[in-house]
């Protein structure tokens, strides 16, 4: 099945904040982070069922190299994948449920 991927506005903020943080630590590291996230978005788009449901119909794809999970939901009725957020794995999981 072919899906369309939709990003909630907060996803862009998550990526920008994390990019800025990594760049403040090591020049160019933020760019590497963004590249890893984009690659994971491609995997989600082409193989969303690869990731199991973790909570409230939400699946989590973990990035390689960086400790982040991409939280998304598959909407079968519209053939859409909605990316809800990008969270550091050490953050309080209660934050996930608030979005």
Would you name each region that the model predicts?
Residues 73-99:
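Enriched for short, Lys/Arg-rich terminal
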